[in-house]
């Protein structure tokens, strides 16, 4: 019963993240939605790792790697967004095509 609730929560978080990525026009909001997606994936990894084989921590260890990648993305992403804002004076995704320059 608890596993079903966790998986429903994970699917809900993933759906919110995908919806936000599709509809968002702001880069900061898109980064936040990407973090929601990564957290939903981590929740699934830990849940299925505990469900199928609780003695081996493969899902937990992989989840730690995903958290490390998300931390790097959380550090580098806003720096890139602020750099684009300084050059383009906008954080809107449709106005930040850097190939047109």
Curated annotation (Swiss-Prot):
Q: Does the keyword Chloroplast apply?
A: yes
Enzyme Commission identifier(s):
7.1.1.-
Q: Which UniProt keywords are given for this protein, alphabetically ordered?
A: Chloroplast, Membrane, NAD, NADP, Plastid, Plastoquinone, Quinone, Thylakoid, Translocase, Transmembrane, Transmembrane helix, Transport
GO BP annotations listed: ATP synthesis coupled electron transport; photosynthesis, light reaction
Q: How does it sit in the membrane?
A: Multi-pass membrane protein
Source organism superkingdom: Eukaryota
Among its keywords, does the record have Repeat?
no
User: Kind of enzyme, top EC level?
Assistant: translocase
Q: Which GO terms describe its cellular component?
A: chloroplast thylakoid membrane; NADH dehydrogenase complex
Its annotated compartments are: Plastid, Chloroplast thylakoid membrane
What is one Pfam family matched by this protein?
A: Oxidored_q2
What catalytic activity does the UniProt entry give for this protein?
a plastoquinone + NADH + (n+1) H(+)(in) = a plastoquinol + NAD(+) + n H(+)(out); a plastoquinone + NADPH + (n+1) H(+)(in) = a plastoquinol + NADP(+) + n H(+)(out)
Locate the transmembrane regions by residue number.
2-22, 32-52, 61-81
Q: Name one molecular function that GO assigns to this entry.
A: oxidoreductase activity, acting on NAD(P)H, quinone or similar compound as acceptor
HAMAP family, per database record: NDH1_NuoK
Task: Family membership, please give it.
Answer: Belongs to the complex I subunit 4L family.
Summarizing the function annotation, the protein's role is:
NDH shuttles electrons from NAD(P)H:plastoquinone, via FMN and iron-sulfur (Fe-S) centers, to quinones in the photosynthetic chain and possibly in a chloroplast respiratory chain. The immediate electron acceptor for the enzyme in this species is believed to be plastoquinone. Couples the redox reaction to proton translocation, and thus conserves the redox energy in a proton gradient.
The family database entries (PANTHER family) matched by this protein are listed as: NADH-UBIQUINONE OXIDOREDUCTASE CHAIN 4L, NADH-UBIQUINONE OXIDOREDUCTASE SUBUNIT ND4L
What assembly does the database describe for this protein?
NDH is composed of at least 16 different subunits, 5 of which are encoded in the nucleus.
* Protein name as annotated: NAD(P)H-quinone oxidoreductase subunit 4L, chloroplastic
The record lists the organism as: Liriodendron tulipifera
């Amino acid at each position: 019963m608890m596993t079903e609730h966790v998986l429903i929560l994970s699917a809900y978080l993933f759906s919110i993240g995908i919806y936000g990525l599709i509809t968002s026009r702001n880069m900061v909001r898109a980064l936040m939605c990407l973090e929601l997606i990564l957290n939903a994936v981590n929740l699934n990894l830990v849940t299925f790792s505990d469900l199928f084989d609780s003695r081996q921590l493969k899902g937990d260890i992989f989840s730690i790697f995903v958290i490390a990648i998300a931390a790097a993305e959380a550090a580098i992403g806003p720096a890139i967004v602020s750099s684009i804002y300084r050059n383009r004076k906008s954080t809107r995704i449709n106005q930040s095509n850097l190939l047109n320059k």
